[in-house]
């Protein structure tokens, strides 16, 4: 209610300002003149307050040698700049991301080039790109098991821009009349060498990926592959289709050959197992008559850990913490930290998840106000996160968001062992 | 005898309205609104009850009866976002998200009274059959019925100018004849190239009391476009067609 009042107040305040300049509806065509260059982006500030769970394994792993109390403050700022230059068939595009963080660890400042590539478009059927770019394959909203050439996205913030990889790619498109309306082919080369995409996988390999897209019988269908040695060979497919004017379904399936899983038991012994992993996602988007959109997705992560494997991992951390408390020796905790990075520590590292997001457009007659709630449930251990949020975009180029997250689960469960019990953040983002 | 009288009355009063070829009239209205393939610029203005406005500028291309695509040029928060419609299929591309997602016709990518079907309007004849036509003075009233369940509005009452054969007002109705919104066509303007049509479209809705949305057209002209410009793969590049 306080929020509704706050947003109403802001609306009224800015309403008064715009009324002062009220005029007839005009369209100055000079606004449509095209420039060969473009510079834009956004700046945001995002203070966050974490409520810590001091009994959780991941709290112990991170804070075993310091006492940060029961809450933690963090102040974040981001500047995302993008620019493009177009001449003839060529276009140069760059997007950089600068993050500032002030947390219990002190100040941190990092600038990353998310994308930077040269694009050539010799015809409307063909585009060729060289440079750093994101491909964003897959139809899922929260997860994309077929996004073989992308960094994993955070299901808690699936719309954030991601850092790409250095690639050479092309898009060839052909349109037809009849049930097959479009076909396109996207071949991609991904070099992985020292200082070039070296986080992608094994180095000194030239990887090849590809995607064939069909719009067939009003259904989007993609066939995808990746091979070359930096990662094991993998194939995938996805689809998406509108069933009615307010109901869409989508799905993905990925088959990964010889996936190598590294895991620990509760004593800290490391094991490696190799198998063909199958991941899948099925989802829907549904709009009700009252303008509420539901996004529901089920994700089967074939590369994920079982409940037993996850319990062993948490038990190992607890054992390491007990050893540290008793002896001051943190060797086991350091080993646990090593096996966490990129493995147990990736988002949704277990096998079966359910995602539900409900967002209501403009309730209480407040235009541009969208309250939402998102839940992610780990089906195996019944732990979950619940995130309500309020978004207001009524002021041109300014977006205000208040978001909270509450997580719950039993001890040794996925969400039950996260370092935080809750999180509240305010985000103000200004586009220019 | 009663049947014979009824037949005479039908012949006297019924024939004039049925004599009009509704389908041909609707196709003529479509062609008078815009060429089959064209480009245009549009400004969308959402007006709130207190007079506060939010504006969007779009570049739009259309080909044939069922292909239309738009890219947002302003404001900065929306720049680069594009929408594509192929028949009943609609997608929305957000540069940050980086991939087109399917959207539905009843949603609205801009908020306000216009929904996606209004913003990515196809030819009316592509989506509707003419059930009947009435002539009231210097105005035609076309009763339109959606060809499929996937069309945003089940029924339309299209009021057309009797001379210019241009729409004056359209009432959008549900299957149960409940009014969803009314669209008003205003300010007929010569865009050049033989295109003379309303340059302003306004809409209001009993579902959004006090709110109004306005669409202003500029630089509307016929253009030959390749089919490939209307594909998902092309969505990040629509602005290159300007």
Where are these regions (language model features)?
Chain A
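Solvent-exposed loop/turn segments connecting transmembrane beta-strands
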Residues: 71, 103-109, 160-162, 197-206, ...
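Outer membrane beta-barrel
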Residues: 77-190, 214, 409
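Beta-barrel outer-membrane channel/assembly domains of diderm bacteria
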Residues: 19-128, 390, 399-405, 419-428
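Membrane-embedded beta-strand positions of outer-membrane beta-barrel proteins
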Residues: 41-43, 94, 130, 170, ...
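Repeated loop/turn-to-beta-strand initiation elements of outer-membrane beta-barrel proteins
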Residues: 88-93, 125-128, 177-183, 216-223, ...
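Extracellular/periplasmic loop regions
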Residues: 236, 248-365, 374-375, 415-417
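Outer-membrane beta-barrel "beta-signal"
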Residues: 170, 354-358, 419-432
């Amino acid at each position: 209610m306080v929020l509704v009042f706050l947003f109403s107040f802001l609306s009224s305040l800015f309403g008064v300002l715009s009324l002062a300049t009220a005029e007839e509806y005009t369209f100055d065509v000079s606004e449509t003149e095209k420039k060969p260059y473009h510079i834009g982006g956004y700046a945001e500030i995002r203070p966050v307050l974490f409520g810590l769970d001091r009994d959780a394994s991941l709290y112990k792993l991170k804070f075993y040698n310091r006492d940060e109390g029961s809450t933690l403050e963090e102040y974040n700022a981001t500047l995302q700049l993008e620019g493009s230059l177009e001449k003839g068939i060529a276009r140069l595009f760059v997007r950089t991301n600068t993050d500032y963080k002030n947390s219990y660890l002190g100040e941190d400042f990092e600038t990353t080039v998310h994308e930077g590539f040269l694009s050539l478009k010799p015809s409307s059927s063909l585009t060729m790109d060289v440079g750093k770019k994101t491909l964003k394959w897959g139809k899922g909203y929260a997860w994309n098991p077929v996004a073989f050439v992308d960094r994993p996205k955070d299901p808690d913030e699936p719309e954030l821009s991601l850092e790409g990889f250095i690639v050479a790619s092309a898009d060839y498109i052909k349109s037809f009349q009849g049930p097959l309306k479009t076909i396109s082919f996207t071949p991609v080369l991904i070099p992985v060498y020292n200082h070039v995409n070296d986080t992608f996988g094994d180095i000194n390999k030239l990887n090849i990926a590809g995607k064939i897209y069909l719009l067939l019988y009003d259904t989007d269908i993609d066939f995808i592959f990746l091979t070359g040695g930096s990662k094991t060979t993998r194939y995938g497919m996805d689809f998406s289709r509108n069933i009615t004017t307010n109901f869409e379904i989508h799905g993905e399936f990925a088959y990964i050959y010889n996936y190598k899983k590294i895991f620990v038991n509760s004593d800290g012994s490391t094991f490696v197992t190799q198998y063909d992993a199958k991941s899948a996602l099925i989802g829907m988007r549904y709009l009700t008559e009252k303008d509420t959109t539901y996004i529901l997705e089920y994700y089967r992560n074939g590369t994920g850990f079982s409940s037993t494997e996850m319990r062993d991992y948490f038990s190992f951390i607890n054992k390491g913490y007990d050893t540290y408390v008793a002896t001051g020796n943190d060797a086991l905790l350091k080993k646990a930290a090593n096996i966490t990075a990129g493995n147990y520590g990736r988002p949704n590292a277990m096998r079966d998840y359910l995602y539900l997001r409900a967002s209501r457009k403009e309730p209480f007659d407040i235009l541009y106000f969208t309250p939402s709630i998102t839940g992610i449930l780990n089906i195996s251990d019944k732990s979950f996160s619940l995130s309500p949020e309020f978004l207001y975009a009524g002021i041109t180029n300014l977006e205000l968001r208040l978001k909270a997250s509450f997580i719950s689960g039993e001890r040794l469960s996925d969400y039950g062992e996260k370092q935080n019990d809750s999180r509240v953040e305010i985000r103000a983002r200004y586009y220019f | 005898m009663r049947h014979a009288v009824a037949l005479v009355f039908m012949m006297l009063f019924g024939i004039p309205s049925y004599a009009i070829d509704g389908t041909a009239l609707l196709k003529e209205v479509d062609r008078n609104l815009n060429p089959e393939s064209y480009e245009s610029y549009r400004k969308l203005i959402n007006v709130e009850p207190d007079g506060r406005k939010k504006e969007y500028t779009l570049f739009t291309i259309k080909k044939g009866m069922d292909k239309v695509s738009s890219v947002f040029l302003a404001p900065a928060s929306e720049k680069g976002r594009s929408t594509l419609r192929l028949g009943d299929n609609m997608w929305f591309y957000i540069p940050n998200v980086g991939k087109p997602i399917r959207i539905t016709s009843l949603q609205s990518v801009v908020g306000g009274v216009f929904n996606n079907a209004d913003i990515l309007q196809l030819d009316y004849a592509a989506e509707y059959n003419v059930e009947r036509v009435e002539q009231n003075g210097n105005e035609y009233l076309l009763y339109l019925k959606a060809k499929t369940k996937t069309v945003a509005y089940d029924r339309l009452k299209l009021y057309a100018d009797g001379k210019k054969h241009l729409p004056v007002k359209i009432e959008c109705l549900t299957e149960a004849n409940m009014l969803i919104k009314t669209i008003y066509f205003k300010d007929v303007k010569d865009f050049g190239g033989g295109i003379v049509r309303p340059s302003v479209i306004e809409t209001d809705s009993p579902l959004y009391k006090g709110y109004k949305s306005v669409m202003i057209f500029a630089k509307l002209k016929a253009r030959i476009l390749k089919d490939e410009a209307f594909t998902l793969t092309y969505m990040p590049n629509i602005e290159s067609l300007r």
